[in-house]
């Protein structure tokens, strides 16, 4: 009986040594990106009146400039409470200084509501397919 208990304990100890190493964490999309998607979804769903009094912003190429370009475009909108949280989230997602953002000069203006929808689609693609 003692030999049997010793064998079981030995196997248990050796089994612990043979277990695989630490399990890699799956790389989940950043929390800030999820927050941005939620915020943009809320903004686009709650449009009973015109967003930001139909203010216009520069249309930017989000695939080239990313969140920094979006933030730069929305910076000139100051009197619109609906997008303040979006601006704060974009500020956290933009990891470059404003002077480092190299983008072609914009030539087209679009309504803020259209820009927000465009930014929402871009963010969803990043969330699905990664950076």
From Swiss-Prot:
<dbReference type="InterPro" id="IPR009079">
    <property type="entry name" value="4_helix_cytokine-like_core"/>
</dbReference>
<comment type="subunit">
    <text>Interacts with IL13RA2.</text>
</comment>
<dbReference type="GO" id="GO:0006954">
    <property type="term" value="P:inflammatory response"/>
</dbReference>
<dbReference type="GO" id="GO:0043306">
    <property type="term" value="P:positive regulation of mast cell degranulation"/>
</dbReference>
<feature type="signal peptide">
    <location>
        <begin position="1"/>
        <end position="18"/>
    </location>
</feature>
<dbReference type="GO" id="GO:0032496">
    <property type="term" value="P:response to lipopolysaccharide"/>
</dbReference>
<feature type="glycosylation site" description="N-linked (GlcNAc...) asparagine">
    <location>
        <position position="42"/>
    </location>
</feature>
<dbReference type="GO" id="GO:2000231">
    <property type="term" value="P:positive regulation of pancreatic stellate cell proliferation"/>
</dbReference>
<dbReference type="GO" id="GO:0032733">
    <property type="term" value="P:positive regulation of interleukin-10 production"/>
</dbReference>
<dbReference type="GO" id="GO:0120162">
    <property type="term" value="P:positive regulation of cold-induced thermogenesis"/>
</dbReference>
<dbReference type="GO" id="GO:0035094">
    <property type="term" value="P:response to nicotine"/>
</dbReference>
<dbReference type="GO" id="GO:0005615">
    <property type="term" value="C:extracellular space"/>
</dbReference>
<feature type="glycosylation site" description="N-linked (GlcNAc...) asparagine">
    <location>
        <position position="121"/>
    </location>
</feature>
<keyword id="KW-0325">Glycoprotein</keyword>
<dbReference type="GO" id="GO:0051281">
    <property type="term" value="P:positive regulation of release of sequestered calcium ion into cytosol"/>
</dbReference>
<dbReference type="GO" id="GO:0005144">
    <property type="term" value="F:interleukin-13 receptor binding"/>
</dbReference>
<dbReference type="GO" id="GO:0042116">
    <property type="term" value="P:macrophage activation"/>
</dbReference>
<dbReference type="GO" id="GO:0050728">
    <property type="term" value="P:negative regulation of inflammatory response"/>
</dbReference>
<dbReference type="GO" id="GO:0071345">
    <property type="term" value="P:cellular response to cytokine stimulus"/>
</dbReference>
<keyword id="KW-0964">Secreted</keyword>
<feature type="disulfide bond">
    <location>
        <begin position="52"/>
        <end position="80"/>
    </location>
</feature>
<dbReference type="GO" id="GO:0050714">
    <property type="term" value="P:positive regulation of protein secretion"/>
</dbReference>
<comment type="function">
    <text>Cytokine that plays important roles in allergic inflammation and immune response to parasite infection. Synergizes with IL2 in regulating interferon-gamma synthesis. Stimulates B-cell proliferation, and activation of eosinophils, basophils, and mast cells. Plays an important role in controlling IL33 activity by modulating the production of transmembrane and soluble forms of interleukin-1 receptor-like 1/IL1RL1.</text>
</comment>
<dbReference type="GO" id="GO:0035772">
    <property type="term" value="P:interleukin-13-mediated signaling pathway"/>
</dbReference>
<dbReference type="GO" id="GO:0001774">
    <property type="term" value="P:microglial cell activation"/>
</dbReference>
<feature type="glycosylation site" description="N-linked (GlcNAc...) asparagine">
    <location>
        <position position="76"/>
    </location>
</feature>
<dbReference type="GO" id="GO:0030890">
    <property type="term" value="P:positive regulation of B cell proliferation"/>
</dbReference>
<dbReference type="GO" id="GO:0009897">
    <property type="term" value="C:external side of plasma membrane"/>
</dbReference>
<dbReference type="GO" id="GO:0045944">
    <property type="term" value="P:positive regulation of transcription by RNA polymerase II"/>
</dbReference>
<keyword id="KW-0732">Signal</keyword>
<dbReference type="GO" id="GO:0071260">
    <property type="term" value="P:cellular response to mechanical stimulus"/>
</dbReference>
<comment type="similarity">
    <text>Belongs to the IL-4/IL-13 family.</text>
</comment>
<protein>
    <recommendedName>
        <fullName>Interleukin-13</fullName>
    </recommendedName>
</protein>
<keyword id="KW-0202">Cytokine</keyword>
<dbReference type="GO" id="GO:0010269">
    <property type="term" value="P:response to selenium ion"/>
</dbReference>
<dbReference type="InterPro" id="IPR001325">
    <property type="entry name" value="IL-4/IL-13"/>
</dbReference>
<dbReference type="GO" id="GO:0005125">
    <property type="term" value="F:cytokine activity"/>
</dbReference>
<feature type="disulfide bond">
    <location>
        <begin position="68"/>
        <end position="94"/>
    </location>
</feature>
<dbReference type="GO" id="GO:0005576">
    <property type="term" value="C:extracellular region"/>
</dbReference>
<dbReference type="GO" id="GO:0009612">
    <property type="term" value="P:response to mechanical stimulus"/>
</dbReference>
<dbReference type="GO" id="GO:0002639">
    <property type="term" value="P:positive regulation of immunoglobulin production"/>
</dbReference>
<dbReference type="GO" id="GO:0010155">
    <property type="term" value="P:regulation of proton transport"/>
</dbReference>
